[in-house]
Amino acid sequence: KTYDFSEMFIVWNTYMDRAQATVRTHGDISFSQGGSFYDVLYGIKHYGLVPDSELPAGVKHGDTLSDFSEFSRVCDPFVEGIVKGRKLQTDANGNPLWKEALAGILNAYIGERPETFVYEGKEYTPKSFAESTGFNPDDYVNLASFSHHPFYEPFIIEVQDNWRWST
């Protein structure tokens, strides 16, 4: 069976994860556009998948492609401001308010992540849908070759977009 998965579902979750890592490291991890192949595998494994019809690219722009130019001008300084803050504000349950605010930005520019959805007459969560496809992220590996690492050996790819420090 052929599927058309939503890239934006992975993008939404990756931006939130990257922001959390940036805040946790006091800005030592770059919060910017870009990512690695592992971000996709991690996203599928931890968050699941949704069909493109549930969160299509460009849905907020009336286009078939997403435009991140304004999004980046809004989101990047927001995360930088959180990093520079002296004390993070929390709600009554101790949850950081900035995550809710960032989710609002992501929802405004990318679209809202579905908690549940119906696909071909059956109700799914993103995780149950991913499981139903039979796609196993553990069946895939990153391949790279750099002359300063031994060939045919795993290593952490030292590039800015590999902020998860995956091999």
Segment roles from a protein language model:
Residues 1-167:
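Catalytic-core signature of thiol
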